[in-house]
Amino acid sequence: MSDIRVRFAPSPTGYLHVGGARTALFNWLLARKQGGTFILRIEDTDVERSTQESVDAILQGMEWLGLDWDEGPFYQTDNFPLYREYIQKLLDEGKAYRCYCTAEELEAKRELAMKEGRKPKYDGTCRDLTEQPADRPFVVRFRAPQDGGATSFNDLIKGTITFPNDELDDLIVQRSDGTPTYNFCVVIDDAIMKITTVIRGDDHVNNTPRQVQLYQALGFPVPQFAHVPMILGSDKARLSKRHGATSVIAYRDMGFLPEALMNYLVRLGWSHGDDEIFSRDEMVAKFDISNVGRSPSVFNPDKLLWLNAHYIKHGDPQRLADLLVPFLKMRGVDPANGGPQLAVAIKTLQERARTMLEMADSALFYYHAPESYDRTALAKFEKEHLLAVYATVAEKLSAATAVTAAEFDALFKEICAEKGWKMPQVGQPVRIALSGGTHAPGIGEIIVTLGKEETIQRIQRAREFVEKQ
């Protein structure tokens, strides 16, 4: 294994959304490409908002996508004693100090700065206190460099980024209740876990110079950084629930395949020539963080749907059958209780289905004979014609020796030639008889899947229905 160590560090305050999943994917790909280590860390320091339900949802989403981790999951709340040790170290070395300013005082300072046209920042009131007030609540602030210099870091995606030190105020590293803050915890965790490359969303860019200063103050090596551009909705606003589903598990429940979502996410910001389709192994082999663009990506549901249809069309029928069972059971169908083999039925549906939900709806007629028929479609044909078609087809099928879809299709061509009918004049009525509607696989495929006996019975029931009209 290489020395590359990366991490995905979600906050358990909600589900695993597509933006987080893409960040996890990029970290996972870099680790697998370099033979490195992928670590899962749960950043649960926000005790009030963090829930076990969210942790479970994140792990479930990761597992569904196949983003296996090598170490973890680790929880930040388990490290509180360690954080306190390092905060005390900063205090002992004069690199941090206690700040006794009240919330009201800080708000007044902020309002004054805004009024005077200055960027709001802490003014260092408590930075050089010689006496510590007794029995007053305090926060601990990091003593940021005030030498007029700058803090820079090289971003693997955005290039060199520099922040003037006079724009960075003294960061709070410990709240008044004694809990450490995010920016401090993440530095300690990444340092202790020996993270070499931090890949995360570019909403963290402004946190980075503060974190770099903390690494340096504590004597830790500074990792490499790669800030991934955000994902936008079709209106160019940041992707959110109002743009549709954003939860990874929601896409699973809507019938998307994990490989389709992975393929789509990897192309949101990363490219390899004009290639669109990538297997998991191809992603690992071709991924390079330097090929991630700097501009935001727009989430396109239609493109994801196209990819999903591709993977369904080319998927293994038996695997798809296993995935389809829960969707069928939600519709009251258990393929184990009778009907055609599900994998056989799926072969007739793969060409047209875009999601597993669509496939489940399309498969229902194989397991439940139609209880009603598309009257609008039937009305396009004269009653006498329908009765003639059903009688002729039932008779021909009873005597037929055909066993393959192609042979049954040939039989229908013979019927058309013999009767002077065009194929739609036979195919549509028969498709309605077998499935209840006009949107179904080819006639030959349906007959092979249902079996000749079931096919004839359904045609006879349709004939009886037409006779009563």
Swiss-Prot record:
Query: Pfam families given for it?
Result: Anticodon_2, tRNA-synt_1c
Which positions in this protein are listed as binding ATP? Answer: K241
**Residues the record lists as binding Zn(2+):** C99, C101, C126, D128
Q: Which InterPro entries match?
A: aa-tRNA-synth_I_cd-bd, aa-tRNA-synth_I_codon-bd_sub2, aa-tRNA-synth_I_CS, aa_tRNA-synth_I_cd-bd_sf, Glu-tRNA-ligase_bac/mito, Glu/Gln-tRNA-synth, Glu/Gln-tRNA-synth_Ib_cat-dom, GluQ/Sye
Where is the short sequence motif 'HIGH' region located?
A: 10-20
Keywords recorded for this protein, A-Z: Aminoacyl-tRNA synthetase, ATP-binding, Cytoplasm, Ligase, Metal-binding, Nucleotide-binding, Protein biosynthesis, Zinc
Recorded GO cellular component terms are:
cytosol
What's a GO biological-process term for it? glutamyl-tRNA aminoacylation
> Which cofactors go with this protein?
Zn(2+)
Q: What does this protein do?
A: Catalyzes the attachment of glutamate to tRNA(Glu) in a two-step reaction: glutamate is first activated by ATP to form Glu-AMP and then transferred to the acceptor end of tRNA(Glu).
- Quaternary arrangement and interactors, per the entry? Monomer.
Protein family:
Belongs to the class-I aminoacyl-tRNA synthetase family. Glutamate--tRNA ligase type 1 subfamily.
- What's the name of the protein? Glutamate--tRNA ligase
Q: Which organism is it from?
A: Pelobacter propionicus (strain DSM 2379 / NBRC 103807 / OttBd1)
Q: Which gene encodes it?
A: gltX
